[in-house]
Amino acid sequence: YEDLYTIAEGQIKGEESIINSMMHPKPSTLNPQPSSLNPQPVFIDTDLSVIKVWSEFVFNKCDNSILTQIANRTYHLYLLCNIDLPWVKDELREYPDLESREKLYHYYKDFLINQHFPWVEISGNYEERLQKGIDAVNQFILPQRR
């Protein structure tokens, strides 16, 4: 539990580094005059909400410093993946049982319902999920670029 804030700090530094490099790119031969007038979207697979949910799921609590950081950060769109695909083992995944997966999914959904930013549930087979994700991102970024 004590390591979670250290992990959260690393997450914040990583996000800020990526966003800063996108907003202030270095000149190159292909792009001699970088501009932040039309920045590209940044996709973040894991953010502080994942640390919060995991902490609450495993330890039944979350460090207040993490909650404060969540309240102070802004994200424009979340894609919440449903658990309707079979579980596939890899070195980062835990909880192969359906009951735990359902419980975690509801933790994430409850978190998103109680936030003030848009989110889209992604479900279906792999192709349907990809298309839903593309559609959700396009609906968000295309009106901003007009």
Model-derived segments and spans:
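A glycine- and Lys/Arg-enriched "phosphate-lid" helix/loop adjacent to the NTP-binding pocket
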Residues: 54-126, 135
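Conserved nucleotide-sensing/catalytic segment adjacent to the nucleotide-binding pocket
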Residues: 1-25, 38-61
